[in-house]
Amino acid sequence: MDKMLFWVSVFTIFLDVFAQTDLDKKVFVFPRESSSDHVNLITKLETPLQEFTVCLRAYSDLSRHYSLFSYNTPGKDNELLIYKEKLGEYSLYIGGTKVTARVPEEILAPVHICTSWESSSGIAEFWINGKPLVKKGLKRGYSVAAHPKIILGQEQDSYGGKFDRGQSFLGEIGDVYMWDSVLSPDDVQAVYYGSYVNGSILNWQALNYELNDYVIIKPRVWD
């Protein structure tokens, strides 16, 4: 292989592994249970969060618990974690404290999840497939720390690592957005139907990410 072809190959691999790109109508595929496969979502968040909304789509046939969105900061485990406990139960952790929302659910169905929280009231909201669940409260007056490691596919037990296969995600994740505000009900509906974009912290259509180990990008073929 000549030098030019070699460096073109290296550059292509680099773009595939560490990239900013429009992932509209695509998904990250996590094809196996592991303690290593994950995606690092890269953001320059330098100010603590007083409120936020996270939305994503997921499709998995796992029956056990697993992490959907893991946000850790130095010295703070489960600073912000969206976690599926079991069929029909979703938890939000803020500063190591959690609340759980419950919803009737089919095991093999894709799901759209939006979760929001605001410090002033401590109210956490869950929306599953565009429908609001019972509001819960936690960590009133708290600030979610800045400079996070945001991981898909694994739950962090340290800053950016210490993964457990038994908490890993197997399946497909897409349409990941994060805002530094609580979205209105109308905006959540718009996100669910795919017409509201431009997340201020994470934007699926202009995403900085790093693929680690066995994670593949494929077209999304489900709703």
Swiss-Prot record:
Main location: secreted
Names of required cofactors: Ca(2+)
One GO-annotated biological process of the protein: acute-phase response
UniProt domain Pentraxin (PTX): residue ranges: 24-223
GO CC list: extracellular space
PROSITE patterns listed in its UniProt record: PTX_1, PTX_2
Signal sequence, start to end: 1-19
Subcellular location: Secreted
Top-level lineage group: Eukaryota
Cofactor, how bound (note): Binds 2 calcium ions per subunit.
A GO term, aspect molecular function: virion binding
Record key words, sorted: Acute phase, Amyloid, Calcium, Disulfide bond, Glycoprotein, Metal-binding, Secreted, Signal
Residues that bind Ca(2+) 1: D77, N78, E155, Q156, D157
Residue sites binding Ca(2+) 2 per the record: E155, D157, Q167
Disulfide bonds: C55-C114
Carbohydrate-modified residues: N198
Assembly and binders: Homopentamer. Pentraxin (or pentaxin) have a discoid arrangement of 5 non-covalently bound subunits.
UniProt record similarity statement: Belongs to the pentraxin family.
Protein name as catalogued: Serum amyloid P-component
Species for this entry: Cavia porcellus (Guinea pig)
